[in-house]
């Protein structure tokens, strides 16, 4: 199986490509592919950026509170699922609330290593090109809630599945 490749095209023309690891977190990848295929992320922003840590996006409301209207089970060790992908620079992972089964659509991309997140969040991909775009996003000026003063808009988010089909995710 060839891993799917997601392309995030920013409103300013920057582009990042991310390889998704279906063998590492299969339901998480199905969820992400499903949302991308439906155009869910088009026009959303990276609403939370923290230098030395990560950039977070995927909230349709743009304030950190939104999602797709459902959640999925967290595919990580603390939740009883083997996932050995470490939260190193460039890794893609699902954001969630305190509940380990609360991930929906919000995701984050690591701009620095964060081993304290390992086994507690569902890592499921890695940036393969365009890490410079992530670095530019994380360097933008923010308010006291880590929200960029100038919105960092994902103009278009697409996925290439190389002919592989992905079922809808299992929802909690």
Model-assigned labels for residue ranges:
Residues 1-172:
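Cyclophilin-like peptidyl-prolyl cis-trans isomerases
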């Amino acid at each position: 199986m060839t891993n799917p490749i997601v392309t995030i095209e920013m409103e300013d023309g920057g582009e990042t490509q991310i390889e998704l690891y279906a063998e590492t977190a299969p339901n998480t990848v199905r969820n992400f592919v499903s949302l991308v295929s439906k155009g869910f992320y088009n026009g959303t922003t990276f609403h939370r950026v923290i230098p030395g840590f990560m950039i977070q996006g995927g909230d349709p409301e743009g304030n950190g509170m939104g999602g797709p209207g459902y959640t999925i089970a967290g595919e990580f060790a603390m939740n009883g699922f083997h996932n050995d992908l470490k939260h190193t620079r460039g890794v893609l992972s699902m954001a969630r609330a305190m509940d380990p089964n609360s991930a929906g659509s919000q995701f984050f991309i690591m701009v620095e290593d964060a081993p304290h997140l390992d086994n507690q969040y569902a890592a499921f991909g890695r940036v393969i090109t365009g890490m410079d775009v992530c670095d530019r996003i994380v360097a933008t000026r923010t308010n006291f809630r880590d929200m960029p003063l100038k919105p960092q808009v994902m103009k278009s988010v697409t996925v290439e599945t190389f002919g592989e089909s992905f079922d809808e995710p299992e929802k909690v």
